[in-house]
């Protein structure tokens, strides 16, 4: 049975259309008072949700792009850009398309995308706190707010909804909602008290109250080299292996050397592990870097090169390298094999018209004219596993019975002596693992704070 078509909805008072005469007045008043600073960054990336239930994804991608947070992976063509289709780590897109997404899962996505996030439910805050945070985001261009609320409290059709808050008029105590369902409602001003009441409602899917989150740019780009991929449900089994099986394996089996620990971890790696951790190097040959990259891109590649060098200078890397060199390729998942074309060789200008191994995803593609550009999608080497072992929580190894071996392992994975750049990269991976664990256990709506 076909559904009757609709063309937008009329705003009901007390909401005021942003483009109306009064809406413009409210905007000008707020602009004069300095509470529209965040508006311009947001409006530059204002988007319409691509599916009726994608309001949470659209709001988040809009905010991440407005903060110039680099996703570290391509959207389309050569472009790195946040799109709703890329925000799938905490809930499969098909489920979001059908049922929408919870507040906790949007918070999870924001954390996993590398943003700094502060999230509050209405029962964890007050209207005065909310007003203070609205002012904070409205007077700055490096912090934005996403609100989740029940539309019917605002006399609008629909139920739960997400949208960014684009500004605030203090004299009128009104907030600007940049409604991402632009096919339905235009941006509009609403009394802040009414918006609070709309947030102070129960989400029937979780039994928890709605709320708001503050999203800001981290001190540095997250995931310069490594990130976790959750494009399909395989990540569930892999996250379980890393967070549950590895601690059990090292505590239940006799391990008396570091090499034996590595063997126990690697021998049971899920077959699809190479799709779980991806390398975001996007490295090109030296002459191509000099010719076609901006100074910002060159600086980024230099950081990646330094980070890769730091990984390979760790004592743990030397153990991993020795271990993988001592076993045959077919005794381990292929992704763990020692390969010829490690990332450092590409970084130093290794040239070849063909991929030098099957699984490293080294591709030579045509650039301008007949020039070829070497792109490394993800490594299949020792540095990946070194980074992963460093990223596992320290308590992973607490079940090792040999106390001297336990102390040696603790020293190998300790972040204290490592450079700041490597520490930040490892902590980013560790937080991603923790967020995935929360999602796997359906605890993302219980704990909104960033993983420690």
From Swiss-Prot:
<feature type="domain" description="Peptidase C83">
    <location>
        <begin position="1"/>
        <end position="220"/>
    </location>
</feature>
<comment type="similarity">
    <text>Belongs to the phytochelatin synthase family.</text>
</comment>
<comment type="function">
    <text>Involved in the synthesis of phytochelatins (PC) and homophytochelatins (hPC), the heavy-metal-binding peptides of plants.</text>
</comment>
<dbReference type="InterPro" id="IPR038765">
    <property type="entry name" value="Papain-like_cys_pep_sf"/>
</dbReference>
<dbReference type="GO" id="GO:0046872">
    <property type="term" value="F:metal ion binding"/>
</dbReference>
<dbReference type="InterPro" id="IPR015407">
    <property type="entry name" value="Phytochelatin_synthase_C"/>
</dbReference>
<dbReference type="InterPro" id="IPR040409">
    <property type="entry name" value="PCS-like"/>
</dbReference>
<dbReference type="InterPro" id="IPR038156">
    <property type="entry name" value="PCS_N_sf"/>
</dbReference>
<keyword id="KW-0175">Coiled coil</keyword>
<protein>
    <recommendedName>
        <fullName>Glutathione gamma-glutamylcysteinyltransferase 2</fullName>
        <ecNumber>2.3.2.15</ecNumber>
    </recommendedName>
</protein>
<dbReference type="GO" id="GO:0010038">
    <property type="term" value="P:response to metal ion"/>
</dbReference>
<keyword id="KW-0808">Transferase</keyword>
<keyword id="KW-0012">Acyltransferase</keyword>
<dbReference type="GO" id="GO:0016756">
    <property type="term" value="F:glutathione gamma-glutamylcysteinyltransferase activity"/>
</dbReference>
<dbReference type="Pfam" id="PF09328">
    <property type="entry name" value="Phytochelatin_C"/>
</dbReference>
<dbReference type="Pfam" id="PF05023">
    <property type="entry name" value="Phytochelatin"/>
</dbReference>
<keyword id="KW-0104">Cadmium</keyword>
<dbReference type="InterPro" id="IPR007719">
    <property type="entry name" value="PCS_N"/>
</dbReference>
<dbReference type="GO" id="GO:0046938">
    <property type="term" value="P:phytochelatin biosynthetic process"/>
</dbReference>
<feature type="coiled-coil region">
    <location>
        <begin position="287"/>
        <end position="315"/>
    </location>
</feature>
<keyword id="KW-0479">Metal-binding</keyword>
